[in-house]
């Protein structure tokens, strides 16, 4: 996916993988997220002082993790015995590791915003590079994804454990996960969180991570999304030069776990120190369906930050605090989420009734005729603003690829939305929002006595080589690039 945009001598680079937490094995949730972290650790070519000496130690560590996860959680003696071996050998292996070589190399290219993220159906690796560094960046990324080496793994566990513990303490995260669990009692959207379950986090498998990488990180399941100042023909040749030898494998398959219709209200309570709040959600069909398009319009009728029914009738009238709604369009299913907080003296149940009352207004058509046209104008303006930045354009590419929507259809989305009438929205609301087909999560203020914690095992601090450099880094840094020619404004 390429779009040339000569706004500045920069290029936004997003490498997207059509795989996320929904693709995790049932017995190893959190795996996609672990892998994202490990893709910053290097390969057999960089990130190591001597890979031939490092590899036998890494192989031992991988085998020990398999032994560790096979031991019952209650067998603390044997688990501690094996963990002590993992910790000890990891310290030896770390003596060969060169820390942060990937970050050093992209920084040397002049990259900004280096990052990555994992969600339920995608993993995306991000950089913003100078336009004269495209070839070096392509060379580096091709090497990065050729054969990643999962070194310094047990210290990375500590980072992931801390992420999990923060999530367990976060009221918003608890509400969100409870909402997904209620809406998707079968599908992985609700049953496999991105971070993973505590038992699986405590029993990680490097072997399973490698299997996941080999299955999903293949050229026919990945997309290079570039937006910026570059020449199309030259860039395509460079992509072919550095990525052309990647082996195409069988297209990964995913079996969608079908959900039965929701026929009675699903209520859940979560507890925490923050102010009371609620989430409410309805389930719909997935991306690139008529559901997803009319859902987008219905959501804007209800809440658009200024003239939606919730905005006018509830927020501006001070009937509740911070009410609103949002659509979440995913590949297999979508959801329409609602939220709000009570004002003093008000209950969460009253907040729920107020939000539902605005859905009833949509069903009755009690919104102005001009609102539908105004929503289209607002969506068009948002789209124009998004496409004015390289990051916005690259993100559009990612969305189309992940949702498996042909680019021409993705670009035609606004034209399809324009066809939707007020009556379509009224009919949609009456057909899909009833008094018994939603999930509601009440966030109560109080101590959450059910919060578990991920207890961190003993991890001995490791000594890594921070100043050393691999031959690959030295070679890459010595490669010359053309200087960027300044462009002066002509007044």
Give the label of every model feature segment:
Residues 3, 8-24, 30-31, 48-143, ...:
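M16 family metallopeptidases and their MPP-like homologs
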Residues 154-158, 172, 176, 206-242, ...:
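Non-catalytic, conformational "gating/processing" segments within enzyme and secreted inhibitor domains
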Residues 161-173:
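Carboxylate/His-rich catalytic cores and anion/metal-binding grooves
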Residues 41, 45, 94-101, 108, ...:
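Peptidyl-prolyl cis-trans isomerase
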Residues 2, 231-271, 276-277, 281, ...:
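Proteolytic maturation boundary segments
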Residues 29-41, 300:
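Active-site recognition of the HExxH zinc-binding catalytic motif
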Residues 139-143, 161, 295:
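Alpha-helical secondary-structure segments
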Residues 1-5, 114, 210-215, 263-270, ...:
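Short, surface-exposed beta-strand/loop micro-motifs that present aromatic residues
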